């Protein structure tokens, strides 16, 4: 398997989904603006997403994929099918209970996660109503993530990577065509989320059948393999929960700030998630099953080379992305969001949060490479301990930054915490002698810094000659923005080429 081609396939699918996601957010911003209704929806949408990351894409994948890879390589197809059946049964049961409980307890959940909303009765009631509609998304997307994890282990990476596009299509369709028929209109977005979850699950099932892993969920509390996953999920849930608890606490802080703060942070987070999703999530998706196979077969040299390859790709693409995100924060927010009810003030507040987030972009992406280094070895406790330390320091930074920087201070805390998390993970990998960097890192980093400086100069020069970004229609603004971005990309890779960088060095292959 060519890892670079697999990464390109997953990244391209993820990029398409993120671009469509930006279109979705731009449409939502234009139709609904940034106020009480959107604050209510984003809280109601964020909570199922947080639980999805805990139960599905987070803890479950960390516990499930390494054991699934072991079954696939050592136990044979029949045993693997039985294993998948029992695991899917337990996951369905657990998530069904969580979903029903969440729908019944929606008002109390809001009281805990966004207590500032309780001061406004209408806002609190609307958020509770929206949460009851969006909660089934947890069950649907968790099952979709289970299917995706299996497909990834069979190297069918592009199929799960495309699935999130269906959620964006659902939300765009409901926002444009269904919102006028709902009262209040924001209810359309909540129903779009649930429909999107159904589409993501149904789309992947035929592909699961093609690889012979489409089985009916069954409950067996005594199956050794399924119980290993459950046992691993304990510390995994704790570790993932720590990072998600940090996001919930940030929402609690933001709920006490000016109206619109939750929305400003959401839109900034969406922009930051573009590079972190396209690269970080794609790398993590490919590396976890690949590292798991190397560990299961005892090939430590291959394991070490995979880690080094992933880290170099991180810095190659994340460093310029972080710098460009900060430089282009203004043009990005204005070009994508400043239309209709989304005012210039909203764009400015979103820009401030985006600049703060960009500080931690490298950390966010590097974590996606370093953490699988532990998960693939079925060591979940080490990342958990690091996550707890990171959570404590994040809240201390929140208290320090929220006064002078308001919502941007909360974003800055998340960014700095991501860098701290990455640093501690790297330290433990070296300390435990799990990973040893390959030769040539100093020269590699020096070349990157020089190329980023060249790119920064080109971007600043392009911004200087561009007209005011709030002028013109969306297509005109986006064309100008694309011209600036392409000029920056060309400058960066041209500088690397002059310095002797070769893309073929990253054409890693593994089995």
Show the residue positions of the predicted features.
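Membrane-embedded alpha-helical bundles of multi-pass transporters/translocases
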Residues: 1-511
């Amino acid at each position: 398997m060519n890892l670079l081609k697999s990464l390109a396939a997953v990244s391209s699918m993820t990029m398409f989904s993120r671009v469509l996601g930006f279109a979705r957010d731009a449409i939502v911003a234009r139709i609904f603006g940034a106020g009480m209704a959107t604050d209510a929806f984003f809280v109601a949408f964020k909570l199922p997403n947080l639980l999805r990351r805990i139960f599905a894409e987070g803890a479950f994948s960390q516990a499930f994929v390494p054991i699934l890879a072991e079954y696939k390589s050592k136990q044979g197809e029949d045993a693997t099918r039985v294993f998948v059946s029992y695991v899917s049964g337990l996951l369905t049961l657990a998530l069904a209970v969580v979903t029903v409980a969440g729908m019944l307890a929606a008002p109390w959940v809001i009281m805990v996660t966004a207590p500032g909303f309780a001061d406004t009765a209408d806002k609190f009631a609307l958020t509770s109503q929206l949460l009851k509609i969006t909660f089934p998304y947890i069950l649907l997307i968790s099952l979709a993530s289970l299917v995706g994890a299996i497909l990834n282990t069979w190297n069918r990476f592009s199929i799960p990577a495309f699935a999130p596009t269906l959620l964006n299509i659902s939300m765009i369709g409901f926002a444009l065509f269904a919102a006028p028929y709902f009262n209040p209109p924001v209810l359309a977005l909540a129903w779009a989320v649930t429909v999107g979850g159904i589409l993501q699950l149904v789309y992947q099932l035929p592909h699961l059948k093609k690889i012979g892993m489409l089985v009916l969920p069954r409950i067996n509390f005594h199956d050794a393999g399924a119980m290993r996953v459950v046992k691993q999920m304990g510390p995994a849930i704790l570790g993932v929960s720590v990072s998600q608890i940090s996001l919930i606490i940030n929402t609690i802080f933001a709920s006490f700030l000016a109206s619109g703060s939750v929305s400003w942070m959401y839109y900034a987070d969406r922009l930051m998630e573009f590079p972190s999703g396209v690269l970080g999530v794609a790398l993590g998706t490919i590396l976890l099953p690949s590292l798991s196979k190397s560990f299961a077969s005892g090939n430590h040299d291959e394991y070490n080379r995979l880690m080094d390859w992933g880290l170099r790709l991180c810095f190659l693409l994340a460093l310029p992305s972080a710098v460009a995100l900060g430089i282009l924060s203004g043009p990005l927010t204005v070009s994508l969001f400043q239309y209709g009810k989304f005012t210039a003030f909203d764009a400015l507040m979103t820009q401030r949060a985006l600049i703060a987030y960009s500080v931690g972009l490298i950390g966010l992406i590097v974590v996606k490479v370093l953490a699988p280094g532990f998960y693939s070895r079925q060591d979940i406790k080490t990342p958990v301990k690091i996550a707890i330390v990171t959570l404590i320091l994040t809240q201390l930074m929140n208290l320090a930054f929220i006064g002078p920087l308001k919502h941007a201070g909360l974003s800055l805390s998340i960014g700095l915490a991501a860098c701290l998390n990455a640093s501690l993970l790297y330290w433990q990998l070296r300390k435990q002698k799990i990973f040893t960097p390959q030769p040539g890192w100093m020269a590699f980093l020096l070349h990157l810094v020089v190329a980023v400086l060249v790119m920064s100069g080109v971007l600043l020069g392009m911004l200087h000659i561009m007209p005011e970004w709030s002028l013109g229609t969306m297509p005109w603004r986006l064309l100008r923005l694309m011209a600036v971005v392409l000029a920056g990309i060309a400058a960066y890779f041209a500088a690397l080429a002059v310095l002797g960088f070769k893309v073929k060095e990253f054409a890693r292959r593994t089995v």
